[in-house]
Amino acid sequence: MVDMSKVKLRIENIVASVDLFAQLDLEKVLDLCPNSKYNPEEFPGIICHLDDPKVALLIFSSGKLVVTGAKSVQDIERAVAKLAQKLKSIGVKFKRAPQIDVQNMVFSGDIGREFNLDVVALTLPNCEYEPEQFPGVIYRVKEPKSVILLFSSGKIVCSGAKSEADAWEAVRKLLRELDKYGLLEEEEEEL
């Protein structure tokens, strides 16, 4: 089994939905967001880019938001607090505190060893491998629901997790499967 302390995971992106519990006049909100775009004929919300934290917000008149590009849940909380403070300055009344729901977290990582993906694909259940279409094995984890892309270099991308703990659990499940089928054993060097 691979030593889990040697496996590295890094958050690349977090997407969250947010309910502000307030109706918004998007024309007024537009003035609060200097780095923003609003064209209701093309898209029904404001696309707003913040520099600190570095995230993008999709702001809808219903008071619903989508926050993307965050590297931490704290970044999302800071972005929502920053927007809420600006909205209060133009008289927006909130029925209650904003509700943040993480929808997806994307992690990149490294298992620390190389793999023969043809062997992995023929051996592991719950995976797909079409090297003409995509250079990695697509491994689906049922619980916690997520997808891991495994590349021959040992690099991985885990998406669909709702928390860092879920991502680690998904990676542990992949490693257990690889170990179960002997795919983590060191290959002997040919003489």
From Swiss-Prot:
One of its GO terms (molecular function) is DNA-binding transcription factor activity. PANTHER family: TATA-BOX BINDING PROTEIN. General factor that plays a role in the activation of archaeal genes transcribed by RNA polymerase. Binds specifically to the TATA box promoter element which lies close to the position of transcription initiation. PROSITE patterns: TFIID. The gene is tbp. It comes from the Archaea. Transmembrane segments: none annotated. Belongs to the TBP family. Keywords: DNA-binding, Repeat, Transcription, Transcription regulation. SUPFAM superfamilies: TATA-box binding protein-like (SSF55945). InterPro entries: TBP, TBP_archaea, TBP_CS, TBP_dom_sf. The keyword S-adenosyl-L-methionine does not apply. This is TATA-box-binding protein. Sequence repeats lie at residues 11-87, 102-178. One of its GO terms (biological process) is DNA-templated transcription initiation.
